[in-house]
């Protein structure tokens, strides 16, 4: 699972072929999380246009769906392989935290993935928007709902805040708020994971913010 890959930084045709190849090699186990991105410096470096990234993302989704379903790409270009193992392409999760980004779930996605969870009630509102977009497009069933969170456990848990402040420095004071809110005890992390389950998360992805392997062991002790 990619959580999430910033599609507007990339060429849609190449990305579609790469994803289809990985899906075929893995026997259909690829879940592709995609979003538009929020860091303008990423786009300056690429380089790629930043302010029209939402429109370009939707054009990319249209193209990738055509490629994966075996349709001609254009009047001049026929179907392009390799075919993915999953019919219609890999499972596609749309990431984001604004209503506009979440509205794309119903039209193009198989589900929604939230980002950097701190408050289950906030995630509930995002999940509700994803389900609303699903119904608006007249789709059956429900979207897959995935939550992701940061955590730091053990004697060096305070380093987790340093990582968040550095990575999200472009948020300004918001980076400090994020750093202070990451769970740093097993009780706090357990409460957050349970809270996300209560608001409808089908899966919770936990990202350690301390670069030590024992973070995985400490998480395993908690979740069993």
Where in this protein do the model-derived segments appear?
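Active-site-adjacent structural elements that line small-molecule/cofactor binding pockets in enzymes
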Residues: 1-224
């Amino acid at each position: 699972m990619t959580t999430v890959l910033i599609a507007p930084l990339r060429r849609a045709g190449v990305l579609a072929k790469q994803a289809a190849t990985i899906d075929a090699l893995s026997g259909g186990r690829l879940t592709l999380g995609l979003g538009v991105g929020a860091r303008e410096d990423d786009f300056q470096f690429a380089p790629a246009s930043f302010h029209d990234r939402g429109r370009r993302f939707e054009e990319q989704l249209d193209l990738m769906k055509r490629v994966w379903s075996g349709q001609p790409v254009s009047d001049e270009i026929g179907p392009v392989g390799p075919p993915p193992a999953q019919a219609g392409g890999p499972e596609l999760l749309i990431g984001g935290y604004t209503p506009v980004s979440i509205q794309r779930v119903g039209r193009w996605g198989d589900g929604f993935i939230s980002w950097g969870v701190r408050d289950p009630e906030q995630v509930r509102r995002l999940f509700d928007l994803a389900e609303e977009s699903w119904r608006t497009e007249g789709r059956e069933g429900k979207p897959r709902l995935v939550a992701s969170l940061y955590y730091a456990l053990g004697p060096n848990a305070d380093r987790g805040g340093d990582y968040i402040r550095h990575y999200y420095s472009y948020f300004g004071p918001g980076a400090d708020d994020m750093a202070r809110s990451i769970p740093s005890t097993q009780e706090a992390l357990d409460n957050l994971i349970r809270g996300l389950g209560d608001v409808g998360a089908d899966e919770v992805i936990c990202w350690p913010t301390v670069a030590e392997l024992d973070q995985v062991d400490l998480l395993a002790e908690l979740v069993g």
